[in-house]
Amino acid sequence: MSIDFQQLPHAGIRSLIPYVPGKSIEELAKEKGITDIIKLASNENPLGCSPLALSAIQTMSSHYIATYPSPWNHPLMSKLASYLKVKPEQLFLSNGSDYLFNILLNCFALHTDRHILTHDYAFSTYAIQANSLQIPINSVPIGHNWEVNITDIVNACNQKTGIIFIANPNNPTGVLIQQEEIKYLLEQIPKSTLLVLDEAYYEFAASQLTVNSLDWLEEHPNLVVTRTFSKIYGMAGLRLGYAIANPSIINILKRVQLPFIVNQVALAAAYAAIDDDDFIQSSLKMNNEGMSQLQAGFNELNIKYLPSSCNFLTFDCEEDSMALYNYLLDNGIIVRPLHAYKMNNFIRVTIGTKEQNSRFLTALKNFYL
């Protein structure tokens, strides 16, 4: 008797469509037999990582690598707390932000009668993880201009709402919600409802924000802010994210965390990277210049794009995006089609170096003209 293992998991898992990351350079090289490839698909830092982080990795001792990590006792905790102007007991270190979302769902929504609330075109991992745990998830429609209507989220929230997930700025649209609206949301929702504010792209948008969301933690203990070293710090390959929240929430997360979830290399690199303000400023400068470069190129071609406060632009192909996506692949350029978000006519492109942006725009012109 043969066993159909596909039928053994619960319905939530059986119904899932796996998260598909941006195609890798290695994968495209193998598929197409080409070597001159640029990747503008996953919102990684085209400058690489901080030189200070790289130096810290290169000078690590073999003994340090051979021992199990102890993130809560690592100097990174106090250093990061000081940098953020919070207390160490308000921090939770994680293997990327995705694990943070999973552990929050496990702690505050699983095996309860509560549901999750987000909005259309939000980061797909929220729904994937909620569905994998069979936690009901409700999604609020967004406006025609791709902006999130906070009033609609307030109206959709009730005492049975366990967690609200909002990315600010949002991925994959890049749209920023003003802090006054986030504050209004916090003031309106039940105090038993967690607001998880995913700020993976915070550093790119910080200059546009009038208030740091961390300033609200004392007044609103149901606020959880998540950030990452993957984007501006260029450490996506090391997987290090963190949450800032009320110590009582952090204490719950620590009870159920997997052991040794953050590795030694990531801890050492992050400890060094925090000091590298020159790298951060260089990354921001390159991103601002690249954003202007791509916007000018889109305008020249009359291509519509969404306003972005991130390190990417999402643009409208006005037809199914796969033809352009495949054309770019043939030319050694990896971007991100957004069919997984039911945005079939849209592509998201990461802001690259000046040379990478020029190559992308040239290919775009050749396709359309």
UniProtKB/Swiss-Prot annotation:
<keyword id="KW-0028">Amino-acid biosynthesis</keyword>
<keyword id="KW-0368">Histidine biosynthesis</keyword>
<comment type="similarity">
    <text>Belongs to the class-II pyridoxal-phosphate-dependent aminotransferase family. Histidinol-phosphate aminotransferase subfamily.</text>
</comment>
<comment type="subunit">
    <text>Homodimer.</text>
</comment>
<dbReference type="InterPro" id="IPR004839">
    <property type="entry name" value="Aminotransferase_I/II_large"/>
</dbReference>
<comment type="pathway">
    <text>Amino-acid biosynthesis; L-histidine biosynthesis; L-histidine from 5-phospho-alpha-D-ribose 1-diphosphate: step 7/9.</text>
</comment>
<dbReference type="InterPro" id="IPR050106">
    <property type="entry name" value="HistidinolP_aminotransfase"/>
</dbReference>
<keyword id="KW-0663">Pyridoxal phosphate</keyword>
<keyword id="KW-0808">Transferase</keyword>
<feature type="modified residue" description="N6-(pyridoxal phosphate)lysine">
    <location>
        <position position="231"/>
    </location>
</feature>
<keyword id="KW-0032">Aminotransferase</keyword>
<dbReference type="InterPro" id="IPR005861">
    <property type="entry name" value="HisP_aminotrans"/>
</dbReference>
<protein>
    <recommendedName>
        <fullName>Histidinol-phosphate aminotransferase 2</fullName>
        <ecNumber>2.6.1.9</ecNumber>
    </recommendedName>
</protein>
<dbReference type="InterPro" id="IPR015421">
    <property type="entry name" value="PyrdxlP-dep_Trfase_major"/>
</dbReference>
<dbReference type="GO" id="GO:0004400">
    <property type="term" value="F:histidinol-phosphate transaminase activity"/>
</dbReference>
<dbReference type="InterPro" id="IPR015422">
    <property type="entry name" value="PyrdxlP-dep_Trfase_small"/>
</dbReference>
<dbReference type="InterPro" id="IPR015424">
    <property type="entry name" value="PyrdxlP-dep_Trfase"/>
</dbReference>
<dbReference type="Pfam" id="PF00155">
    <property type="entry name" value="Aminotran_1_2"/>
</dbReference>
<dbReference type="GO" id="GO:0030170">
    <property type="term" value="F:pyridoxal phosphate binding"/>
</dbReference>
<dbReference type="GO" id="GO:0000105">
    <property type="term" value="P:L-histidine biosynthetic process"/>
</dbReference>
